[in-house]
Amino acid sequence: MAYVFLGVLIILQQLDREVSGRVALADGLKGKKLLLVEDNALNRELAQEILKEAGFAVDTAEDGEIAVQKMKQAAPGQYDLILMDIQMPRMDGYEATRQIRALPDAAKAGIPIFAMTANAFEEDRQNALKAGMDGHIAKPLDIPHLLQVLTDVLK
């Protein structure tokens, strides 16, 4: 448990340095609402904390099935972007993306969806695109890269 705490502390210290060096990020993106879909509780908590520290509003789902339900029930414009894990119980990220893309509400169906996964081979990137995702962010997270991708997409 001490190792996990130390890891969280190191990540948050890195985040503090990254975010303080990117004040413009917070100004332009503060309050943007993300849906973070991640089955691993520790990964979910870490990513949520990183994103909140950067100024995002973050809602979470533990698997693809819950993510699809949240999108079906979401008010128009409730979410600006989805960060989707791939390997999850009940419904994986590929199937969840396909179901979100098939929603009758064009705004919900067209939301930017990025794979956020340890599956980092070119084949994995291509599978994400084929499923309808807009891009791929590899884990472990490179915080500056993650924040840059979010900035580029949400501006």
Describe each model-derived feature in a short phrase.
Residues 1-155:
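C-terminal compact regulatory domains
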